[in-house]
Amino acid sequence: MSDGHEPHTDRGAHSTGHEEVAPLAAKVLVSSDGVVAGTREDRSGTALVAALERAGFAVAEHRVVADGVDSVAGALADMASGFDGLVVTTGGTGFGPRDLTPEATRRVVEREAPGLAEAMRLAAPRGLGRLSRGIAGTSGRALIINTPGSPAGAVESLEAVLDVLPHALRLLADEPTSH
């Protein structure tokens, strides 16, 4: 399901000191049986879209799928294919029997980025983030990160790594960096 977000081209451009490069692109994937069934509102996906746009990302897609390995892996593979940017998932990272987003993500990623997942877990207030099983990794030139299903948890997790995401995405795109 798409909510009509089109890529923005008028903000979020990043300067390398000599030239302007395109704004960073992002997609959001919500894993929720309740949202798919219409019994729950998609607050987490909406919160992530807003946080990404505030950070200067052009949000190209916002999709909702049911929990489960096959549905999430299929959507992630589709969203990452040929995409240069960030794919953020929300939901399915806990201990419930259908919380299988990390397992689905492992089917799609080629290289894991454990430092990002560790930073997101450590940033949660009161340490509840330690219960998240979310992972992060790359698929082609897309960086995929899993965040918890609550709006606050999703945004806090994203914000914990926002400062390094532009650099990571430039590295994935094989663009020059200053390191």
Model-found features: residue ranges?
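Non-catalytic beta/alpha edge segments that cap or flank active sites
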Residues: 1-179
